[in-house]
Structures are given as C-alpha cells and as structure tokens.
A protein has these predicted regions:
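Structural signal for hydrophobic packing residues in well-ordered secondary-structure cores
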Residues: 22, 26, 219, 223, ...
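Short, glycine- and charge-enriched coil/turn segments that flank and shape catalytic ligand pockets
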Residues: 135-139, 221-227, 251-258
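Short Gly/Pro-enriched turn/cap motifs at secondary-structure boundaries
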Residues: 203-207, 234-237, 283-287
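Oxyanion-binding "anion nests"
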Residues: 209-231, 235-239, 243-245
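Predominant activation on well-ordered alpha-helical scaffold segments within soluble catalytic domains
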Residues: 19, 157-161, 212-216, 260, ...
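N-terminal Rossmann-like NAD(P) cofactor-binding subdomain of oxidoreductases
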Residues: 1-205, 224, 286, 298-301
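C-terminal active-site/capping subdomain that shapes the small-molecule cofactor and substrate pocket
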Residues: 247-302
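Short acidic/glycine-rich loop or secondary-structure boundary segments that cap or lie
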Residues: 155-156, 183-187, 238-242, 254-256
C-alpha cells in the first residue's frame, strides 16, 4: 500500500515543486492538494509541465481536508503553518517547508518574523554537522515533525560548517553573498519582473534577512566559538537556483589541502554533495531540478 500524501498550500512554487517530486516517487501517492486562492482549479493549471497529478483539484485548506493522510507537507507562507499543524494527528508525518519551526530561539524568531514562536521541530538537514562528529541525520530517524531548512540557509551552512568544525577560519568574519533566482520570492510576491529580467539588485540588506538566525543557529553547532555572519542576497535574472559566494578569513597555517580534507571528511560519502576539483566552480544549471549541491574551493592569495 502506498503512502497517502497531502500538500497544504500547493498553489505556490514550493507546493508545485513538491508535486513534481512526488510524481516520481514510487511509494507515495499524492491524494490531496489545498490552496485557498485556487479552489476548484486543477494542479495542472498552475503547473503545465506536470503530467501525473495534473487533474487533482484544489480544495480549501481546512482540517477536514487534511485529516486521514500518512504524510502532510505544509507549503504555506511563513507564520501560517503553526495553526495548521495543530489540526493534524500525532502519528502523521508532517514536514513544514516554511520557517515556523526552524528556529530554536523564540527571541530570534519574534525579532525576524514579527510573530509569536510556535516552538521548534527536528531540523531537516541530514548533512548538518552537530555535536562532535555527528550529523543531523541521526536525529531525524523516527521523527513525526520536521522543519525543512531554508534555501539560502542550506547554501551557506553546507559551505561553511566543515571549515568551522575543523577550526580553519575565523568564525567572527564570515561573509556570504548569494545570487538567487526570482522563484525564491514566491508565486504571489510583489516583484516587478521587468527590472529583474534586465538587472540584478540586492535586497534585505544590512542584517535583516530572515535566514540569518537560521544560518547562525546551524553554524554554531559546528563552530569553535561565536559565529558572526554578513549575508547579502542579490536577485538575479534566473528563475531558480542559488549561487552562494562564501568567504572567510583563514587562520594561520591553513592551506587548500587542509580545506579540501575538511570537506572530504564531512561530505565524502554524501550522495547529494559534490566537491569540485581545484579551479572548478559551481554552475546553477548543473544542479537545476536536482537535489545536488556543488562546492568549489579557492584561496585568495592576494
């Protein structure tokens, strides 16, 4: 018997991507899609490239429509998942793709999201370095409530965590500049597409981006000491993908061999993370529509 799945908020980009992934999963059957703005429309009307499940009809996002599934994906706007989560049975696997349950600190959540903190769920980044040489994967087994990591947070965390674990860089001088696709703003975002297609521009500059506390929370689990991050996202004329340029000051005596050894020891057996050869750097088109992450390494000798 297949696992019965529902997507709450399936009319957005995240919901559409979940439907695409589930369509190729041999053991899961998507049976319900909710979307209050699209009730009565078909999933295929918003996702023309979708073949399987294209005839599923959106229903209202209610408790009655979400009960009775084995797994429920919450693809709702930030701060909207907490209430919906209370509707669902304890034995149902619930994965929140929003930010409601990512942060452990209520103070940080309320500061960046301007909303009460609903608590934290098990963080869903299997490759994340935690205490000692352990990874978050060990904590995910058997969990019924999982917080899916943020996109920018994933790109920064995976790039910097091995360096911090091995004490190779100054943890108080981390800088991340991310070129991000327009889909990151969401389907209903008030983004004027004309200037986006003609230029690139920074947004949420000056330490106000909501992924900052999530990244710091992640990196603190690996770092030897406090972590300080400067993060600037730049919207560029591509639809999907992130190219993260992460820089950090090397500590004395650290060379490229030590850096490569750090990444290889952490990610060498990870199926979805590729450490690129020397002088080779990531290209978003190489990982588009995949689960893969590419990591390139360079030392500024100037």
């Amino acid at each position: 018997m297949k696992i019965r799945a529902a997507i709450a908020g399936a009319s957005g980009y995240v919901g559409g991507e979940l439907a695409r992934l589930l369509a190729n999963h041999p053991n899961i059957e998507l049976v319900t899609v909710t979307g209050n703005s699209s009730v009565g429309e078909t999933l295929g009307s918003l996702n023309p490239a979708l073949d399987k499940y294209s005839d599923l009809v959106f229903v209202e996002n209610t408790k009655e429509n979400l009960l009775g599934h084995d797994v429920v994906f919450l693809a709702l706007p930030h701060t909207k998942s907490a209430e919906v989560a209370t509707w669902l049975e304890d034995d149902v696997l619930v994965l929140d793709c929003g930010a409601d349950f990512r942060l452990e600190s209520a103070e940080e959540f309320e500061k960046f999201y301007k909303s009460p903190h609903a608590g934290s769920w098990t963080y869903g980044m299997p490759e994340l370095l935690i205490e000692g040489n352990s990874k978050q994967r060990e904590k995910l087994s058997g969990q019924k409530r999982i917080a899916v990591p943020g996109c920018n947070a994933t790109a920064i965390t995976l790039a910097l965590a091995p360096l911090l674990r091995d004490g190779l860089v100054d943890p108080t001088d981390l800088v991340s500049t991310l070129s991000v696709g327009t889909s990151g703003a969401g389907r209903n975002a008030e983004v004027n597409q004309e200037p986006v297609l003609a230029s690139a521009f920074a947004y949420q500059v000056g330490g106000i981006h909501r992924h900052i506390p999530e990244v710091q929370q992640n990196l603190q689990k690996s770092a030897k000491g406090q972590v300080s991050l400067t993060f600037t996202p730049v919207l560029v004329p591509m639809f999907r993908g992130i190219l993260a340029v992460n820089t950090a000051k090397l500590l004395p005596g650290v060379d490229e061999t030590a850096i490569r050894n750090a990444f290889t020891s952490v990610y060498g057996t990870e199926s979805f993370i590729e450490i690129l050869p020397s002088a080779t750097f990531p290209n978003t088109s190489d990982v588009e529509f995949t689960n893969k992450v590419q990591i390139g390494i360079a030392i500024d000798e100037a």
